[in-house]
């Protein structure tokens, strides 16, 4: 215990925290082998729809996936610092944590030139960085023999950003068979939704046709689908042997 905390009537407890962790993760890797091409009709279960032919039309269907022979484990490095502070005889408790996570050599299926005979390759194709803030405040508002009232507030904010992808790869589709879909794109936040937007004038106003907005015909970034922040609070009280509590939560999404 620190000497200045022993008789301190305001700050009676304080703790600083710091941690470091590094974790490796291997993907599912299979040796490349010869795969006998087949014939199919229209489309098949692999993503995306490769050839939009009418149902029943047979066409050449090559094996669609190849594996990088130099595939390396994905590496995650995490740094975390924080503080726990208690005030006024621990009637007010404040906890704060900041974490930074760097993920390198992320393992993705990336698109490849169709001339190779494949659609995608499993390879190390990404680097991502995550910043996170967590704040928790708990206060004993009233304390008596037969009655007490407590309030708790929490706040969390997480920012994910794709730092880089494999050379020549602009974006990687991670979810969604057709648009809209989730993509990882270098230099952008993650996860972002991509889909068809609407035509707008120079002032940003929608261009309408028969009262309806017109499609731009081009895929564009529609915004981040994860909450900009999450927060909540709990309120609880006790009267003799009867206790009651309530919990509220809120997520704010800002595209």
Model-derived segments and spans:
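Short acidic/glycine-rich loop or secondary-structure boundary segments that cap or lie
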Residues: 161-163, 205-209, 253-255
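Solvent-exposed beta-strand/coil patches in large extracellular/periplasmic or lumenal scaffold regions
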Residues: 68, 198, 202-208, 212
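Short Pro/Gly-enriched beta-strand edge/turn motifs at strand-loop
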Residues: 214-218
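Aromatic-residue-lined binding/catalytic grooves and analogous aromatic/hydrophobic interfacial grooves
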Residues: 222
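Extracellular/periplasmic, surface-exposed regions of secreted and cell-surface proteins
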Residues: 1-185, 232-240
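Acidic/polar loop-and-plug regions of large Gram-negative outer-membrane beta-barrel proteins
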Residues: 54-58, 196-198, 204
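Glycine-rich, aromatic-lined ligand/substrate-binding cores of catalytic
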Residues: 225-255
